[in-house]
């Protein structure tokens, strides 16, 4: 009997280097700068259909920020936040704006197209907003 060798590798840890950018190169570059603290852009919102890598980019940005000892807050699936969670994110945004740190958030649609509280949608749209495109 011959033993078969299966080529099974563990899932790669999300990094900005292993994200396949495709048409999302500008968004990726902005995240690299923000998560390393080398830009004035401190608020980034990513949106698009599932499978575009939003969660990968959030996790990778958080890891890079830790390497640079940068305070970074991420918010995934903003479109699914409850009223209380939206208020908490709004307050977090304002605290970061008055102090230091970076906020990267993502959702399924542009900030003003998700039925979020008006104050939160406005804040999310104040920063850099990128629609992520899936690879074809």
What are the residue ranges of the model-derived segments?
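Short regulatory helix/loop adjacent to the ATP-binding pocket of P-loop NTPases
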Residues: 111-125
């Amino acid at each position: 009997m011959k033993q078969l060798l299966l080529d099974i590798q563990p899932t790669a840890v999300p990094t900005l280097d292993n994200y396949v950018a495709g048409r999302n190169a500008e968004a990726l570059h902005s995240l690299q700068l923000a998560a390393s603290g080398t830009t004035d852009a401190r608020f980034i919102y990513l949106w698009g259909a599932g499978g575009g890598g939003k969660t990968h980019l959030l996790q990778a940005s958080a890891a890079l920020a830790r390497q640079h000892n940068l305070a970074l807050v991420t918010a995934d699936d903003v479109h699914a936040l409850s009223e209380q969670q939206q208020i908490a994110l709004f307050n977090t945004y304002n605290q970061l704006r008055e102090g230091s740190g970076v906020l990267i958030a993502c959702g399924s649609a542009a900030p003003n197209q998700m039925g979020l509280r008006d104050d939160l949608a406005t804040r999310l749209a104040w920063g850099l907003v990128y629609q992520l495109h899936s690879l074809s």
